[in-house]
């Protein structure tokens, strides 16, 4: 919605009937709570990717930001920007912003230090796994929640780029829908989980992690950085490992100067 004053608002419905793992309902108030917490306690890091609330730069100049997130009723979230947001800041930004359970976190998030110091091992989640054990510097596990509603369903991917979802497990509110162009050849897969426990082994560096991978001790490595060249070359020598890489120094973004020809045409 164009509010006519330079701001734009998205009114997003929250489907009723979904719950956190502790049984509390997931509502629009959870999104307003996390917005109030992020802005009230000046949380930064990844929170700014989803909820860029800083509307001025270091020199006091105005910049694009989220102005407010409000629960207009129990199942509607209104997100307001001070500009008309594009794909990266709406669809891949605030529209995918996380929420946390207000019922659990409200008494904890009273100040920044208390929030960051809290042991969240028992925090409720919206998923099939709950937090289990954490051994600092060694491992971290998730375990399957037998009472979860977050399981099952069929997802179909089409050659034309579209996706279909059919989810009716008898516990969560049933949902089905088609997104994009659902024509052409397709393949489908069932959503799990198909295991009872997931273990994340913690390693001190890449070398140790990829050595464990080579030895079959772990199934994959979660690595926020690129693979080092010598590690890449070592993996290339291991039978059964297939390597896929992007073109080095390739183009990631392409920009047009719309003020000059041909971009202005």
Locations of regions flagged by a protein language model:
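Surface-exposed binding/hinge segments that line
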Residues: 11-13, 32, 48-111, 117, ...
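Extracytoplasmic/periplasmic ligand-capture domains
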Residues: 6-46, 59, 65, 88, ...
């Amino acid at each position: 919605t164009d509010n006519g004053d330079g701001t734009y608002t998205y009114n997003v419905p929250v489907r009723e009937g979904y719950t956190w793992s502790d049984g509390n309902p997931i509502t629009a108030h959870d999104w307003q709570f996390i917005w109030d917490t992020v802005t009230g306690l000046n949380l930064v890091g990844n929170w700014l990717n989803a909820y860029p609330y800083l509307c001025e730069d270091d020199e006091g100049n105005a910049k694009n930001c989220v102005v407010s997130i409000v629960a207009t009723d129990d199942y509607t979230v209104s997100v307001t920007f001070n500009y008309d947001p594009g794909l990266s800041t709406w669809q891949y930004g605030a529209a995918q912003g996380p929420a946390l359970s207000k019922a659990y976190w409200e008494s904890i998030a009273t100040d920044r230090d208390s929030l960051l110091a809290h042991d969240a091992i028992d925090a409720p989640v919206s998923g099939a796994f709950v937090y289990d054990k954490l051994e600092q510097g060694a491992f971290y596990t998730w375990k399957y929640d037998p009472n979860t509603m977050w399981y099952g369903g069929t997802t179909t991917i089409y050659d034309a780029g579209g996706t279909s979802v059919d989810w009716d497990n008898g516990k969560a509110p049933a949902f089905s829908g088609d997104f994009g162009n659902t024509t052409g050849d397709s393949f489908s897969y069932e959503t799990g989980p198909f295991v009872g426990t997931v273990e994340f082994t913690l390693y001190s560096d890449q070398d140790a992690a990829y050595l464990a991978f080579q030895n079959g001790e772990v199934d994959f490595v979660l690595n926020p950085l690129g693979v080092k060249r010598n590690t890449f070359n070592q993996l290339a020598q291991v039978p059964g490992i297939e390597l896929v890489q992007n073109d080095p120094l390739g183009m990631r973004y392409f920009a047009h100067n719309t003020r000059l020809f041909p971009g202005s045409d």
